[in-house]
UniProtKB/Swiss-Prot annotation:
Catalytic activities: N(2)-formyl-N(1)-(5-phospho-beta-D-ribosyl)glycinamide + L-glutamine + ATP + H2O = 2-formamido-N(1)-(5-O-phospho-beta-D-ribosyl)acetamidine + L-glutamate + ADP + phosphate + H(+); L-glutamine + H2O = L-glutamate + NH4(+)
Catalytic site positions: 87, 195, 197
Species: Corynebacterium efficiens (strain DSM 44549 / YS-314 / AJ 12310 / JCM 11189 / NBRC 100395)
Annotated Glutamine amidotransferase type-1 domain residues: 4-223
Alphabetical GO biological process terms: 'de novo' IMP biosynthetic process
Function text: Part of the phosphoribosylformylglycinamidine synthase complex involved in the purines biosynthetic pathway. Catalyzes the ATP-dependent conversion of formylglycinamide ribonucleotide (FGAR) and glutamine to yield formylglycinamidine ribonucleotide (FGAM) and glutamate. The FGAM synthase complex is composed of three subunits. PurQ produces an ammonia molecule by converting glutamine to glutamate. PurL transfers the ammonia molecule to FGAR to form FGAM in an ATP-dependent manner.
Entry keyword annotation includes Nucleotide-binding: yes
Gene (name only): purQ
EC number: 6.3.5.3, 3.5.1.2
Pfam family, one: GATase_5
Protein name: Phosphoribosylformylglycinamidine synthase subunit PurQ
């Protein structure tokens, strides 16, 4: 049986269909999960995709973090289920306290839509096992509130414990230490602002580098 990877849809989610397609291209079974679901439908991993869930009211990701499906995701993550938060999904994971820090307005207060090179810093996670440390991958980024910030002690902890997963090579949004993605203490929960699901086909993306995250998750599930 192929791995089952769920992708959550919230009101205002934009990239759920792309994430479902990426899961399918990688060879797993995509499962659509609705924000009001309490049952994760037997999935082996979850993707929290990008968009503007609930219109970004209050704070980006703040309302979505309280949705019924996220309570189930929090419990599943506690049991070791791989979870990937992309863009707004990363914001949701920080609001749900599955990952530390916060994503704030970009430096210069501009919305950026760019293809960006990321340095792979940590390959010891559920979502980066097929990548190589130091490898550069090319994926799209599109956000207005993607500047990663945290207290100095938290930044120190992330760096010292090797929990920075991706780093911008150009740091266009002003994130502290160029941090583009991080993981939790187990390496099973990963969040990043750029969009790997938009880099899985040569016809539609700048590369196919993003496919490796989904292939890594499939390998993790099979292990």
């Amino acid at each position: 049986m192929s791995a089952k990877i769920g992708v959550i849809t919230f009101p205002g989610t934009l990239d759920d269909v792309d994430a479902l397609r990426a899961v399918r291209i990688a060879g797993a079974e995509p499962v659509n999960l609705w924000h009001a679901d309490e049952d994760l439908r037997g999935v082996d991993a979850v993707v929290v995709p990008g968009g503007f869930s609930y219109g970004d009211y209050l704070r980006t990701g703040a309302i979505s973090a309280l949705a019924p499906v996220m309570q189930s995701v929090i419990e599943a993550a506690g049991r070791g289920m791989p979870v990937l938060g992309i863009c707004n999904g990363f914001q949701i994971l920080t609001e749900a306290r599955l990952l530390p820090g916060a994503l704030t307005r970009n430096q210069g207060l501009h919305f950026h839509c760019v293809d960006t090179h990321l340095e792979v810093v940590n390959t010891d996670t559920a979502w980066t096992g097929t990548l190589e440390q130091g490898q550069k991958i090319l994926v799209p980024a599109k956000h207005g509130e993607g500047r990663f910030q945290a207290e100095p002690d938290t930044i120190r902890m992330l760096e010292e414990e090797g929990r920075v997963v991706f780093r911008y090579t150009d740091n266009f949004n002003g994130s502290i230490n160029g941090i583009a993605g991080i993981t939790n203490e187990t390496g099973r929960v990963v969040g990043l602002m750029p969009h790997p699901e938009h880099a899985v086909e040569t016809l539609t993306g700048p590369s196919v580098d993003g496919l490796e995250l989904f292939l890594s998750a499939i390998g993790t599930i099979a292990a």
